[in-house]
Amino acid sequence: MNILYKRRFWEIDFLRAIAIFMMITFHIVFDIDYFKNYNLVSPYNFWWYFARATATLFLTLVGISLTLSYSRIIHLSKNRDFRKIYIKYIIRGMKIFSWGLLITFITFIFLRKGTILFGILHLIGVSIILAYPLLKFRILNLIIGVFFILLGLFISNFYVEYPWLIWLGVKTTNFYTFDYFPVLPWFGVVFIGIFLGNIFYPNYKRSFKLPDLSKNLMVKHLCFLGRHSLIVYLIHQPVLIGLLYMVGMIDISTLFHIFSCIFNFFRI
């Protein structure tokens, strides 16, 4: 029985790897656009929708993964102390949120304009902490998810003069950032993922038939990538920028100038 609850569902890791490739593809386009000013990414064009489709897939998988981890912990725990289980989720959420804060710091230092204040890692960290009490429900998560999405779309048309509600989805008039995934509407996507996880993987069991492709060499490598999506997310942009610079597709002299100023500042 324990072996059953320790196994992974290869399709989740595979889909996460697909989302990673979509993310990398978009960021290649975005980096070229940013450094060359080609205007490739603009509101409501193909790449704008592509980025949101990528985020939707990522966050849906976050919700599904939360239900899987919850089911696994519940069935493997000899003592079902829900308080201790919740503490594990809080710690996990805080770790991911901390990585988001690191990205906030780095983008503030190197970019200034477009600083990432509440990106996808911030959202995932908060979602892991806040979603825990509702992980066992089905329809309720669907209702909450749809409500959050609709409410988020509604409040996106309103602007305020203070920045304290940016995390929620209420922006200031001249707000600009490179990565923005506020609680409303994007937490709603996580809730829908939780709903789907409870439908398709009840009690850590697949409710549908699927061929086992986990031994396929290509699938196996992709699943490995999917299992390490956080590491890929954290390192892929510096790697992409370095590669694009090496092949002469972008000029990052501005970043070198900023880095030099920071170095000289700390030498004083």
List each model region and its residues.
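Alpha-helical transmembrane segments and their immediate juxtamembrane cytosolic regions
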Residues: 1-268
